């Protein structure tokens, strides 16, 4: 990616954990990358799925801010906090970049209700941890079950799994839909399967077992 930087480059986005694969960038590789990025290029780290990560080597964008003033960290209340319908999140950066963002931001984009819900969510850390830990445990269980079935799955640090199904994607999607399971599919590439409630995950496991047989 650093080789693609030119004089016209102004912003670089890094998504970790990545959507739709769930893979993460590690601290050492990000630090090495940042050393090759000019200081006038802003590096935005999208960490929407940060709370689901259990890889100790994964980068935490907040730890980079002191030494890299061109880094901006984005986080959201839509994923782990469960406030997707309220459309609220935040950016963490230097005061200079924050001032630039305020100058170009559309006013009144976040409602009072969304702000109150976000503040309340920050105070409910125990509930957040319980919910995230349950999802992570289910992610591991579903990963193990589907791997035993023979599916090629990328180890994920998000609240979903990526199945590399290639040319068979559309057929597998039809089987899943016939079992009442709806996933995000990319034809000829793969399927992103979100981790839900235990019973929902069981249904997905059963549907995919039938897709293997099909």
Which role fits each region the language model picked out?
Residues 86, 157-159, 187-191:
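Short amphipathic alpha-helical segments
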């Amino acid at each position: 990616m650093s080789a693609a930087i030119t004089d016209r480059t102004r912003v670089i986005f890094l998504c970790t954990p990545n959507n739709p694969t769930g893979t993460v960038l590690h601290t050492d590789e990000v630090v090495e990358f940042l050393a090759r990025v000019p200081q006038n290029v802003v590096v935005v780290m999208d960490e929407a799925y940060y709370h689901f990560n259990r890889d100790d080597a994964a980068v935490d964008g907040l730890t980079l801010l002191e030494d890299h003033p061109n880094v901006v960290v984005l986080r959201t209340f839509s994923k782990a906090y469960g406030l997707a319908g309220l459309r609220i999140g935040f950016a963490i950066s230097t005061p200079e970049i924050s001032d630039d963002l305020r100058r170009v931001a559309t006013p009144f984009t976040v409602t009072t209700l969304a702000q109150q819900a976000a503040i309340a969510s920050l105070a409910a850390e125990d509930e957040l941890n319980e919910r995230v830990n349950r999802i992570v445990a289910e992610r591991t269980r579903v990963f193990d079950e589907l791997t035993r079935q023979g599916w090629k799955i990328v180890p994920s640090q998000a609240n979903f799994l990526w199945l590399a199904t290639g040319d068979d994607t559309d057929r597998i999607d039809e089987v899943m839909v016939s079992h009442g399971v709806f996933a995000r599919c990319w034809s000829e590439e793969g399927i992103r399967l979100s981790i839900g409630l235990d019973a929902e995950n069981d249904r997905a496991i059963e549907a995919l077992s039938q897709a293997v047989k099909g």
